[in-house]
Regions:
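Short, surface-exposed beta-strand/loop micro-motifs that present aromatic residues
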Residues: 147-148, 163-178
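Active-site-proximal beta-strand elements of phosphoester/diester hydrolases
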Residues: 158-159, 176-184
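Helical hinge/lid and interdomain linker segments adjacent to catalytic or ligand-binding clefts
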Residues: 2-103
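Short, solvent-exposed polar/charged micro-motifs at secondary-structure junctions
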Residues: 36-43, 126-129, 167-170
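A glycine-rich, often tryptophan-bearing local segment used as a flexible ligand/cofactor-contacting loop or short
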Residues: 56-164
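Sequence-pattern detector for short linear motifs
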Residues: 4, 143-144, 181
Length: 184
């Protein structure tokens, strides 16, 4: 039996959640459209960066770096102009290994990778709620079988925790921009 569970409906899922607030218009594009300049991030108030399980894997047939050098530059420019970013991904910190990449995480997302979490039970708490996410392979939804533990830097703070009390999401509200990053 083949169990994949990824029907690539993440844009629809995120759009439906955003739409439920009844306050926002939604557009979507690929990271390649941003990196090539076909889409200008400055045209949007908020960018929802959905990374899922993207990571640089030498065994992969394609290049799936969480934040390519080009994307890092686009995001730096976007936040310097007051943009707001919402980032989610199971390798958001751990895939950024060299000094330049870690500086991007610190300067833009205001996070520091702090390890990986396995077999958490898929529970997160914070912002006045508790909820689960898929952390076991199944045929319905992609699963983040391991997640990033991320720590806040500077004026950022831990907004959500995994069930073992490690940090699952970091929020930052600066003078120029805002960022919210989830490690799952």
């Amino acid at each position: 039996k083949f169990v994949a569970g990824n029907d690539f409906n993440y844009v629809t899922t995120h759009a439906q959640a955003i739409q439920s607030a009844k306050s926002y218009n939604i557009s979507s594009c690929s990271s390649m459209a941003v990196e090539s300049g076909d889409v200008r991030m400055s045209d949007f108030n908020v960018a929802d960066i959905i990374l899922g399980l993207e990571k640089n894997d030498p065994n992969s047939l394609g290049y799936y770096k969480t934040f390519s050098h080009s994307m890092q530059q686009h995001l730096r420019n976007y936040v310097s102009g007051g943009g707001r970013i919402f980032v989610s991904g199971a390798y958001v910190g751990s895939d950024m290994a060299n000094e330049e990449e870690r500086n991007f995480l610190a300067d833009v997302l205001r996070i520091s990778p702090d390890g990986r979490l396995r077999n958490n039970g898929g529970m997160v708490m914070g912002l006045g709620m508790n909820f689960g996410f898929h952390d076991k392979l199944n045929d319905k939804h992609y699963a983040a079988t391991t997640s990033d533990i991320i720590s806040p830097l500077g004026n950022a703070y831990c907004a959500m925790k995994y069930s073992n009390e490690t940090s699952a999401a970091i929020a930052y509200k600066g003078e120029r921009y805002r960022a919210f990053t989830m490690g799952f």
